[in-house]
Amino acid sequence: MKGWFLVLFLIITAGGSVLSAAAFFYIAKSQSKFVKILVFALCTLVIAIGVRFYEETYYSFYDMSYIKGLQYAAMAGLDWLITWFALLPLAIVGTAVVFIKRHGKRSGVHKVHSVDTGRRRFLKRAVLVPVGAGLVTTFGLTDGNARVVTERQSLSFKSLPAELDGYIIGHISDMHVGVFLGADDLGRAIDEVVENNADMLVITGDLADEMCLVPECGAVFSEKASRFRDGIYFCYGNHEYFHDVQYVTTMLKNAGVHILRNEGVVIRPQRFPGQAFFVAATDYSFAKTKGAFERQAEKFTKQALQGRPQDMFTVLLAHHPDFFDPAAAAGVSLVLSGHTHGGQLIFAAPVASLKYAYLRGLYRQGDTYCYVNRGTGHWLPLRIGCSREITIHTLHTV
């Protein structure tokens, strides 16, 4: 998160947090509630400013010994903002219910007593709501940032030559090396792929968000590129263009990473002498409308597949999973994507699915598979029921 996007995120979450707190103070009939709301608002403002300062000036202290402490402080600030913001719908409903009860018609002492007793019972239960929400958010932030799961996929294809049965592709995506995950996390992810005996590593975009960490990423790739028999291949994501795409490109090339941009290459596996398959990758499409995106996706896919030998098994790297459709139409065997982060929150999946037809995991159209990586990293560390992911694809012949 950077620039105006970060500012907008902080304004919305901070504003929602203050409204949530104000609603809870109203429900509780808190004494001096205006003073409490003011203090809460000031604390929230300080937290929002602190998070923005951390993210926007990270480059100036990322190599200091106290950086981990600042990272934990920023995560605690996000915990506060996200927790109280998430309570806003419940706070609004609760305020409406209490308002109606307080201002509705009263008929006698018995009803007043009943309302007061019900309110006290409600308040005792309501206290647990912010506490519970805070615990869930804290878990989502800490677990989401600390844990990465290795998913192993065994995929069978009619188009894969029998001599290539057992070929292994490691897949990482959306690392977002930056204020919450560093180059050391990238290194550990690559080590995990190596330990699974992958022949090749593919990276489907959004590598780094903090340009000050790009040299460290380069050092990681330079050290580990030779550990893959058939190399490392990379396609651009949208975040490469949000920052300094040329800087990232230069780093990757100098480190021995192969960049494919609407082009492909014949791979001759070292472990399978005399065999070959085709790896291609598309650029990211910034088309604004669905129709324009579909046309550009089809165009980029055709460009990427130019020069593909007839009937050769083909793997396509595309940051956005909606490239699956033109790839399947073009007879690609396997599409590897990312971009969606899997929705990050399991209960947000139905909403995220409205935007992304292919949200996470494995999909199939005819003889074409598409796998959408949930993200090996993230720019917002909150994850619940949708952990970070490293994927190991083992290819088999039907």
Give the positions of each predicted feature:
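Soluble catalytic domains of enzymes that build or remodel membrane lipids, polysaccharides, and related
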Residues: L160-V398
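Non-catalytic terminal accessory segments
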Residues: M1-N145
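Generic detector of isolated residues embedded in canonical secondary-structure elements
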Residues: A76-D79, R121, S154, G231, ...
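Generic structural microfeature
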Residues: Y72-M75, T117, T150, Y358, ...
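N-terminal signal-anchor transmembrane helix
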Residues: H103-T117, R121-A126, L141-H171, G178-D191
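Generic short alpha-helical hydrophobic face used as a protein-protein interaction/packing hotspot
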Residues: L81-W84, A126-V127, S159, N197, ...
